[in-house]
Structures are given as structure tokens and as C-alpha cells.
Amino acid sequence: MKYDFSALEKKWQSRWADEQTFASSADQEKPKYYVLDMFPYPSGSGLHVGHLEGYTATDIMARYKRCQGHNVLHPMGWDAFGLPAEQFAIKTGTHPRLTTEKNVASFRETLKSMGFSYDWSREINTTDPNYFKWTQWIFLKLYEKGLAYISEVDVNWCEELKVVLANEEVDEKIADGYTVVRRPLRQWVLKITAYAERLLKDLDEVDWPENVKQMQRNWIGRSEGMEIDFELRCHRTNLRVYTTRPDTLFGATYLVISPEHPMAEKLAIAQQLVAVKKYIEQAKLKTELERTGLQKEKTGVFTGSYAINPANGEALPVWISDFVLTSYGTGAIMSVPAHDSRDWEFAKKFGLPIREVIKSPHDVQERVFDGKESVCVNSANDEISINGLDFKTAFDRMAAWLESKGKGKRKVNYKLRDWVFSRQRYWGEPIPIKHYEDGTMRPETNLPLTLPEVEAYQPTSTGESPLANIESWLYGEDEHGKFRRETNTMPQWAGSCWYYLRFIDPQNSDALVDPSLEQYWMNVDLYIGGAEHAVLHLLYSRFWHKVLYDLGVVSTKEPFQRLFNQGMILGEDNEKMSKSRGNVIPADHVLSTYGADALRLYEMFLGPLDQVKPWNTHGIEGISRFLNKVWRLVWDENTETQKTTEDKPSEAILKRMHKAIKKVTEDTEQLKFNTAISEMMVLVNELHKAGCYSRETTETLLVLLSPFAPHITEELWQALGHAESISGAVWPVFDAKLATDDVLTIAVQVNGKLRGTFEAPAGCTKEEMIESAKKVESVAKFLDGQQIVKEIAVPGKLVNFAVKPQQ
């Protein structure tokens, strides 16, 4: 019988679906394992082989944990609101719902064709009113807690898309060729800053890649500093700045405020007012990225006003520059050009003084010195001196002096800003708020608030969403009076902030999630997805989860205990797969040519899961040959009879088998799938070489291979007489004695160069290893006439002799 991947893969996918083989159990006595993918946005372009890498990895872990006796939750759904479907609707008039349904069907078919063991009874879609009812419910809870508010804010406006972008989205859209400008707009904002400290601190509680944790730490941007008041000459008020370096106050030679600072125009003297207004208008056309780039040329305008340095009484000129942002600190900074590169460049351009206050190894007039490791100089007045002090001591002494004078106070600041949450588009969750004629706002009482049908999907010219044109939906009246519904919708991130909870209890119409089910399943044991979501989805979902924790809806402080970021699979040209490059490898093409098992194995065999690696079609052909070898362990293709015997394997084969069990188990736990597959390849070759077709070894191999190649292993498992699915088979346990080699090959080096090898029994002493090494013929000649200076023995691995010529 020949291996026909097409027929048997369809057979088993159909059977798994009919029997609901992978439905999670209601048995809460079993240990649970919740393994989750970052669920996909169902785009019109379908899935390519790169998309499948993470899904394959989670499926391997789901199947592996089932065999280990865990109750596994492994669901799939669709993050289906979003701009692409709406843009398509604007071009074609096709309702986004229809486009989304079509794309979801395509994605679902591909994922099922891969044999992924999802519990499809839990499938969710963020555009389903039964789902976004609870997204709206969470929003109202945020509103009730004062964490959702309306503000007139300067937003990142994309004219082509007619939509507001979150700060975290700007870089991507600019890279895609869109124009992004700043403009004021009425927006719903979520107060994520209220959770900044918890979002930072609780990163220590999760098993995440350190680079992702660091990206979140940097984005939150906690800093300890001071707010210092500078008295404004001629204005009877103070200008408050935020600084992390009060120890450098004596070196401040000018102040800078942002163009949006409320005092920007007020500080402009008559002669400077025109220039100041012009500069402020120009700044509005720039994105924050353009304004704050380290390589950008510094621009600015002098207001004509001066402020008094509280440390030395000097009058410092007040400038306006777009590299200062109102959203961070106070929107005003003190500039110490000798010890800050940005301030130094600005001072050089505009001829401002540069004063050394940190002892520098070079002339600060020629080059900035921004190190903290030196001590203070030129920093004293009649009341305080911090000369000779290190950073921490000087910081504390200066802070205490400023506080005693009422000129400053210690302050913890964050770069993190509140989340601009609303979008001016149609295809998103309606925000369930009603605005009344008396100026009050009230929540919708009947959820879900669904989207009306519209004839045109373009945002209005005023920046409102198309919902503003649907008067029958927009206006209403209730016991509180006449109202106008909110026309902004939620961003795509909303539905993905909490979807992991809905998978636990997807049909519940009375609650977001049943408390007993939440307590059993949470938190997510393994979450796999791309690192590009580090400061977007992963931060937003942590924020919402903490709010739900405070509300008593969830029992854990963090949603995802372990996070793993898969590396990207590149095209065969070593470039990122994209239509424009023409290097996309469609998943369906590979599936029809090689089958799901070959594709799954190849993607995991390409290299370490977390590394970037290129696709190579020739490589998958080698995997196909391996699967045929596995097939031939059971079937004789010439006679179409089974080869399986009830014979006991030899001692050597048993040892090889238990070494494989140990290696595959340990590597799978660590998601080192490429080396686990390599170990199974070695075992299969050894079995064929020894002519060993024992049921014991074959069945063990099939169970080890089943998470990686489920279709062929199901078929062969059935052929060996098993009525139940291999997914319920017990994972083999290795015998430590059999998994250890009795005889080891020891390398011998002389002065670090390999000169020979010898075999030694496992457990031999260092002394025995050294004596045996000296007797190796190819080694002895390099020791002859030499003085052995040092002998090094690494048990079970190598012996190294350090030698020099005898005197």
C-alpha cells in the first residue's frame, strides 16, 4: 500500500470534525493547558506559508499536551473588524460583512486543511453582535470607572484613509506611503496611564521574551525626576519644566517649550509674535515621528521672553521647538547643552551658551558629554554646592534644596500616553453612548448596539464616520429626552483585547465569561504570535485584563503566562513575502502538492522557531521522503502487507528509542521543534537499517511524531489495530538508564587542536580518561618530546593537553 497523503488527510480531517475529537472536556479534575494563537485578521489575500508557522507550533503543543493527559483548550477565531474590508467597501460598494464572511471561509478552509486540532465549536468573530455586545459592555465599564473620556486632542490624521491612527500605528502607515498629519479632533480616550505602574511592575510575573518586555518598559517609559518652576520675567507666573537631571540645573542655559504649550503664544513678545505663530502652524503639519527623530535638523523660534534659573538667578531665553512634546512631562524642558546631545545641537545651531557642570574628559564646546558616571562641577551658590558629588547624591541633594525653596517637587513620569480609542469609520464596534440635548451622556441600555445599513462607506468631510449620515439610527428619544448617538466606532484593537476570555465560554449570553470556567482555564499557558504586537495588542490586552481584574471578572492579574514570538519565514529570495515582490508562497499550492504533514514538518524543521529563515521548496521534498520512510515502517509497498512484528527490539534499538523519547520530549517542551524532528529522522533511519519493525518501536515513534504529522500517524495507528485516535495515546516516558550511552566517544586535543578520539565507558573518572588519551596513537606523537603543562578532562566529552617543548 502506497502513501497517498491527499486521500488520508481528507479522511482524517473529516473524521476529526464528525467526532469532535479535539473538543475541550468539561472535566475540571484534569490538569488544563490553554494554548492560543494570535487570531488572524481575515484578509482577502488568504494565507501563505509564513502565516502557518505560528499556528503549526501551537498545534504541536496542543497535541503533545493532550497525549500527556492535559485537558487542552486550543481555539480559533477571527479579528474581523478593520480598515481593509472598509476600504474595499468604499471602492466596490460591497458590504464589509460580505467581504469578511468570504475571507473567513477561505481562512477556515486552509486551517482545517492543515489538520490543526482546534475546538471549532468555540469559533468566534469580533464582528458578531453576540461577541461585540461584550466588547461594548467592557467599554461601558471603563466609562463607569472614569477610564473612558472625551477630549479634544491633537491626533494622527491620515487624509487618504480619513481615519485617526493610534500613536503606535503611525510608523507602519508612513512606511506604507500614507500621509499622516496632526489635527485637533473630538476623541474618545482610554486612560491607560492610570495603569502604567502596574503594567510595568507585573512584567516581572510573566514568562515572556526579554526583548518584548523591554519594548513595553521603554514604551511605558517610567522616569524619576523633578518638576522645577522657573519664574517668568514680566509675566507674574512660573514656567514648570520636567527633568530627570536636576543635578545639572546649574548648566541650564535656555528653556524650550512645545508648539502646543498653552503659553506658547502668550510668551511671544510683539516683535516675535508673527514668527512664533508661523512656527506653531508649521509644527501642526508634522507627525511626532518627524518631530522627534534624533537625526532631524533642529528647528525653533525664540519667544523673546526669559525665565529665571532658581539655582543661580540667571535669565534664560525661552524658545519653542517641535522636538518637545506637550504629551510628555509638562511640555517644557530645561536645556543643558553640555550634557545632552539634542540640546547641544540646538545650542550650536542658534548660538546659545554651553556650560560644563559634569566633569568631562573633553571640551564640551566641541563635543557633548552625556555620561552619568562623572561628578558635578561648577554647581554651587551661596546656599548649596553639589560639586564633586556623583549623580545619585547630587540628584537627592538638589531635589531636597529645591523642595525646601518651594521651587520644585519630585515626580515620577511616564512616556505612555492615554489611548486614543475612537475611529471615524463604519466597520467597527459602535461606541454605546448617547449624547443628550442638555449636554449629558448616558450609556446604551440594550446591548449590543448594532451597525445600521449604509449606502456609502466614506467618512464625512468633517471627519465623522458614515454613521453621522444615518439619521434614523443617529437620533432618538427616551425617558431622559432627545439624544444623538455617538458616531465614532472602536478601533480594531478593541475586539482583540479580550478574545482569549470569550473562547473559554463563547455561547454565554448572560455574562462575558462564567467565573468557574475562567478560574479553571486562565491564564493562557502558551501564547504564540509576532513580536510586532509588543506595544499594541499585547499592551492593550494587559490593560483591559487589569481593569477586568479590578472589576472581579477575572481571577488573574495577567492574561498570558508564557509568550513565544515565532520568527518570520522569508520568501525564497530571502526577502519578506509580499505581493509587490512576487515571492509569496500560497499555502494552498503547497498543501495540494506535498500535503499538510509535509508542510507542517518542513516549517518546523527549517530552523529554530524564533529565528528568521527563508523558504526553500527543495527542502520540503526531503520531508516527503522522510514521511514515506515512516510509512514503510508499517507497510511493504510491494506486497501491500504489513511489516509489523511482535518481536522484542534489540538492546541497541531500545537504547536508541529511549534516547529519542528523551530528546523529543525535552525539545518539544522548549519549542525546539527542528531538533526534535531531526532526532526522529535519526531513529527512523536506525530502525530501517536494523530491519526493526517491532510494534513497540513503531508505536512509540508514531506517538512521538503525531503532534508534528497527525494524519499519517493516525492512519498507521489505525492500521496497527487501534480503534481510538492517536491523539488520546499516552506519551511515552523514557527509561533514564536506557537513554544514557554505556560507551562514549571522547575527543582528544593537544593545545586546543583535535588530534584523535577514543571510546570510554560512561562514568569513567577524569584520571582514567587522561591515561586512555595518552595511549591514543595519533595523540602520542604530539606529546612525544613535549612537556605537558596542563591536563584538562571534561567528563564524557574531551581531554585537552596543554604542552610546550621540553627544555
Swiss-Prot record:
Pfam families: Anticodon_1, tRNA-synt_1, tRNA-synt_1_2, tRNA-synt_1g. A motif ('HIGH' region) lies at residues 40-51. The keyword Nucleus does not apply. GO terms for cellular component: cytosol. Its EC number is 6.1.1.4. Keywords: Aminoacyl-tRNA synthetase, ATP-binding, Cytoplasm, Ligase, Nucleotide-binding, Protein biosynthesis. ATP binds at residue 579. This is Leucine--tRNA ligase. It is found in: Cytoplasm. Gene3D superfamilies: 3.10.20.590, HUPs (3.40.50.620), Isoleucyl-tRNA Synthetase, Domain 1 (1.10.730.10). It catalyses: tRNA(Leu) + L-leucine + ATP = L-leucyl-tRNA(Leu) + AMP + diphosphate. Belongs to the class-I aminoacyl-tRNA synthetase family. Its main location: cytoplasm. PANTHER family: LEUCINE--TRNA LIGASE, MITOCHONDRIAL, LEUCYL-TRNA SYNTHETASE. A motif ('KMSKS' region) lies at residues 576-580. GO terms for molecular function: aminoacyl-tRNA deacylase activity; ATP binding; leucine-tRNA ligase activity. GO terms for biological process: leucyl-tRNA aminoacylation. It comes from Chlorobaculum tepidum (strain ATCC 49652 / DSM 12025 / NBRC 103806 / TLS) (Chlorobium tepidum). It is an enzyme of class 6 (ligase).
